From Swiss-Prot:
Is synthesized initially as an inactive proenzyme, which is activated by self-cleavage at a specific serine bond to produce a beta-subunit with a hydroxyl group at its C-terminus and an alpha-subunit with a pyruvoyl group at its N-terminus. It is an enzyme of class 4 (lyase). One of its GO terms (biological process) is alanine biosynthetic process. Heterooctamer of four alpha and four beta subunits. One of its GO terms (molecular function) is aspartate 1-decarboxylase activity. It holds the Pfam family Asp_decarbox. This is Aspartate 1-decarboxylase. Its EC number is 4.1.1.11. Binds 1 pyruvoyl group covalently per subunit. It catalyses: L-aspartate + H(+) = beta-alanine + CO2. Belongs to the PanD family. Pathway: Cofactor biosynthesis; (R)-pantothenate biosynthesis; beta-alanine from L-aspartate: step 1/1. The lineage of its organism: Archaea, Methanobacteriati, Methanobacteriota, Stenosarchaea group, Halobacteria.
Amino acid sequence: MRRWLLKSKLHRARVTGTEKDYEGSISIDAALLSEADIAVGEQVQVVNVTNGERFETYTIEGESRQMELNGAAARLAETGDVIIVISYGLYVKDEQPEPTVLLLDEENRISERE
């Protein structure tokens, strides 16, 4: 048996912009993607703490401290909203991996690792 478990989380990120006229996705700082072990193109769940929206999209590499929602997802958040970006991994039943959890400050810098 396999289970979907938390693999990575960017907690309390701030939306830096929205671009509705784009194919889709979320642009995330390349260094944050690397630190969180989230691949470019990986499916992620985004939880908007500010308004309660939840949705799935995929990642693209962004600029330093960027956290920008693109395409249809851009309608689900506004600049300044607090979000959580979550990725999951498929693990065998007895596997209990330690997830990578990064808490971010108001400027999308890592403030703490859990």
